[in-house]
UniProtKB/Swiss-Prot annotation:
Pfam families: Ribosomal_L9_C, Ribosomal_L9_N. The keyword Ribosomal protein applies. The keyword Ribosomal protein applies. Coiled coil: none annotated. The gene is rplI. Binds to the 23S rRNA. GO terms for cellular component: ribonucleoprotein complex; ribosome. It comes from Clostridium novyi (strain NT). NCBIfam families: L9. HAMAP family: Ribosomal_bL9 (MF_00503). InterPro entries: Ribosomal_bL9, Ribosomal_bL9/RNase_H1_N, Ribosomal_bL9_bac/chp, Ribosomal_bL9_C, Ribosomal_bL9_C_sf, Ribosomal_bL9_N, Ribosomal_bL9_N_sf. Belongs to the bacterial ribosomal protein bL9 family. GO terms for molecular function: rRNA binding; structural constituent of ribosome. This is Large ribosomal subunit protein bL9. GO terms for biological process: translation.
Amino acid sequence: MKVILLKDVKGKGKKGEVINASDGYARNFLLPRGLGEEATDSNMHILNRQKEAERKKKLEETEAAQALAESLRNKELKMIGKAGENGRLFGAITNKDIATELKKQFKVDIDKKKVVTETIKQLGEYEVELKLYPEISTKIKVIISEK
């Protein structure tokens, strides 16, 4: 019996895959537990529409991330911090601070987890990588100056 998996099933397949399962396994395990449904023509049509919608959504997200990466490329983010002797900052500039400043200066909402940098503890210029989407990233220059 052909079955469309509704959830990941260990050893059988992932959600959305069509598998061949024995009739007993499908009727007694997969179908009653809501792990799969019979692969009828109407169910296959629904599955194909869902996959197409997911593909379009992923394409839109990729295009949006590429546009954002292009708009941020070679931008300079200026930040001000209090520093002591030798240009050492009181406190440090973290990825959260950079994400907040990006929102203020460029009106771009980026999650702090997508800002890839070491904690900045000195005044100066730094290259910071922004991972906007899998395989899409850009670099910006962060300039830390004293008040």
